[in-house]
Amino acid sequence: MSMQDPLADMLTRIRNAQMAEKTVVSMPSSKLKAAVAKVLKDEGYIADFQISSEVKPQLSIELKYFEGKPVIEEVKRISRPGLRQYKSVEQLPKVRGGLGVSIVSTNKGVMTDRAARAAGVGGEVLCTVF
């Protein structure tokens, strides 16, 4: 059976691993998942990530905790296969008054809502992280 929404699966694996207080979570890799992991690392939500060089590459994400609590409090899928959410640069959502980030897929790559505003581009709002 094929997976309908691989990005939602990635976010769910991260959420479940943090609830179970795991240090590393692995999943099948893709270009989009690697780009989202890079944004999460740049924003300080995860410690690191690696892509294995096997026949079927695996993405391993090293989770980050602060004083025993997960750094990611909430991760939510916004645009989904059944209802895509495209926003212009003016319509990009702010998460918790700017404390969290929206991850946006633009024609210039996957980036945060702040970077998209600075670049003056809109795109598909993939998820929000706080």
UniProtKB/Swiss-Prot annotation:
Q: Which InterPro entries match?
A: Ribosomal_uS8, Ribosomal_uS8_CS, Ribosomal_uS8_sf
Q: Which UniProt keywords apply?
A: Ribonucleoprotein, Ribosomal protein, RNA-binding, rRNA-binding
TM ranges are none
Q: Name one GO biological process term.
A: translation
Give this protein's Gene Ontology molecular function annotations.
rRNA binding; structural constituent of ribosome
- Name any one Pfam family assigned in the record: Ribosomal_S8
The UniProt entry, under Gene3D superfamilies, shows:
3.30.1370.30, 3.30.1490.10
Q: Which domain of life is it from?
A: Bacteria
Q: Does the keyword Ribosomal protein apply?
A: yes
This entry carries the following GO cellular component terms, namely:
ribonucleoprotein complex; ribosome
- Assembly mode: Part of the 30S ribosomal subunit. Contacts proteins S5 and S12.
Task: Give the protein family.
Answer: Belongs to the universal ribosomal protein uS8 family.
What is the role of the protein in this entry?
A: One of the primary rRNA binding proteins, it binds directly to 16S rRNA central domain where it helps coordinate assembly of the platform of the 30S subunit.
Protein name per Swiss-Prot or TrEMBL:
Small ribosomal subunit protein uS8
Provenance organism: Pseudomonas paraeruginosa (strain DSM 24068 / PA7) (Pseudomonas aeruginosa (strain PA7))
